[in-house]
């Protein structure tokens, strides 16, 4: 298994402006990975606009409603590392196909639940299917694209969660108003099954050995784990970036989950109208996700470490705007405009932090490194925001909860500044390591050759 491409492969990569394989294959892989992430978050977030219906029918507390969102993130985070280890050893495309089928079937099963406990368990299985998808997808995209465009590509990829959340919130409200809230799960669960079949055509990359004599396909699991976690533990930048990303996502996930309910309770909107209004905020965040990935990457081309102070500044702006929006007294229209502006800034970290993480993680363990990031983001970020806001809401009211939560963005700003100190050292350690391309899984299956 080669660490450095041979002459023909290097020439092909050069002709394709640094892409690992042909640009057409790379963009097809990107499109398919983006599409699955899009439906991943439709399935994950469709429940948010259903909160008023579920609360009314089953008489749940805000904390219980928040837990229906948080349980997905907890399971995703807890299972991300094992799944990434399997993906780094056995292939990313195979792993992604299995994930997509699992979470799609689990989403469809939610429409048959009869009480809170059943829905909670079904949502946990949705998380089980989605476990590791983001990290494995990040590893695939990061390796296929050249480093110069990595942040922009990942910024675009990470627009998918926001766009999926937008459509999930809108569809949930619309379907619930016409056919009942349970039908929403059945409608959004089917497309993922179809996309899973097409994903078999995506071309993977060959797993790169951590050292020339450590082929991961042949060595023992114990030795593999020792080498992998030893490499990650030396990457201090990754750990601080994980902390910063998680803190910012507490703010993001709380806003995603509770804004429809806030508009319903405080501005008298119907659940359907509140879902559409909240979708505007999430959509602005989705567009800004791509924009920030491009802008930050462009401005820091010569000094990549400056991505981190840029993120720090953007997180501080996020906190100030949201605290002002929910902590002050305004006319409804003015408050909503402030919330939209906050939404423009709140997704600033999403694509950029993944790019920073991939800049400093060895290509042989990128799925696992991305899984560490995903673990922090899901367990300490996405899972915390909805349930923490729900608990604060039960105690002091939803408006006060949404005023306090954005202070987590200040913590994120501090962590990103600390991460800058070790970036150059960590990036230099892996600067000369490059992976090879692998054949598409569908081609492998058709010829009967092992990947």
What annotation goes with each model-predicted range?
Residues 14-22, 206-241, 266, 438-441:
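Juxtamembrane intracellular "pre-TM" segments in multi-pass secondary transporters
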Residues 47-48, 236-289, 350, 354, ...:
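Extracytoplasmic gate region of multi-pass secondary transporters
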Residues 122-162:
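Cytoplasmic helix-loop-helix junction between adjacent transmembrane helices
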Residues 78-114:
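Conserved MFS/SLC helix-loop-helix module at the cytosolic interface between two early adjacent transmembrane helices
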Residues 157-204:
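Helix-loop-helix hairpin linking two adjacent transmembrane segments in secondary transporters
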Residues 59, 91, 112-118, 146, ...:
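Helix-breaking motifs and short loop linkers at transmembrane-helix boundaries and internal kinks
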Residues 101-114, 316-330:
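C-terminal ends and interior cores of transmembrane alpha-helices
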Residues 89-100, 298-314:
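Cytoplasmic membrane-interface "Motif A"-like loop-to-helix N-cap segments
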């Amino acid at each position: 298994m080669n660490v450095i491409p041979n002459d023909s492969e290097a020439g092909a990569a050069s002709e394709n402006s640094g892409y690992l394989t042909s640009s057409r294959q790379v963009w097809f892989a990107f499109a398919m990975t983006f599409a699955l992430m899009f439906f991943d978050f439709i399935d994950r977030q469709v429940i948010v606009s259903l909160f008023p219906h579920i609360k009314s029918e089953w008489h749940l507390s805000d904390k219980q409603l928040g837990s229906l969102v948080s349980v997905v993130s907890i399971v995703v985070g807890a299972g991300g590392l094992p799944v990434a280890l399997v993906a780094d050893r056995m292939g990313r495309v195979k792993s992604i196909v299995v994930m997509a089928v699992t979470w799609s079937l689990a989403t469809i099963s939610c429409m048959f639940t009869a009480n809170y406990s059943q829905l909670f368990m079904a949502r946990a299985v949705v998380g089980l299917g989605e476990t590791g998808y983001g990290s494995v997808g990040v590893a695939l995209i990061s390796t296929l694209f050249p480093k110069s465009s990595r942040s922009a590509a990942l910024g675009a990829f990470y627009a998918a969660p926001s766009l999926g959340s937008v459509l999930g919130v809108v569809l949930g409200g619309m379907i619930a108003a016409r056919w009942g809230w349970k039908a929403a799960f059945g409608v959004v669960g089917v497309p993922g099954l179809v996309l899973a079949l097409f994903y078999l055509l995506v071309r993977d990359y060959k797993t790169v050995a951590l050292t020339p004599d450590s082929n991961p396909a042949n060595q023992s699991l114990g030795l593999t784990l020792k080498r992998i976690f030893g490499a990650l533990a030396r990457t201090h930048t990754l750990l601080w970036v994980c902390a910063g990303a998680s803190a910012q996502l507490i703010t993001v996930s709380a806003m995603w989950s509770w804004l429809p309910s806030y508009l319903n309770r405080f501005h008298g909107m119907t659940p359907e109208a509140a879902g559409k209004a909240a979708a505007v905020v999430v959509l602005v965040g989705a567009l800004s996700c791509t924009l920030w990935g491009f802008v930050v990457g462009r401005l820091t081309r010569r000094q990549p470490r400056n991505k981190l102070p840029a993120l720090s500044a953007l997180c501080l702006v996020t906190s100030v705007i949201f605290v002002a929006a929910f902590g002050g007294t305004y006319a409804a229209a003015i408050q909503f405009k402030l919330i939209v502006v906050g939404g423009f800034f709140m997704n600033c970290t999403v694509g950029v932090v993944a790019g920073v993480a991939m800049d400093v993680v060895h290509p042989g363990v990128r799925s696992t490194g991305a899984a560490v990031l995903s673990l922090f983001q899901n367990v300490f970020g996405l899972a915390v925001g909805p349930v923490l806001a729900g608990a604060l809401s039960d105690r002091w009211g939803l408006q006060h909860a949404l005023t306090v939560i954005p202070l987590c963005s200040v913590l994120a700003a501090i962590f990103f500044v600390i991460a800058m100190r070790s970036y150059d050292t960590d990036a230099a350690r892996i600067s000369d390591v490059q992976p090879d391309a692998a054949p598409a899984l569908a081609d492998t299956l058709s010829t009967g050759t092992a990947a």
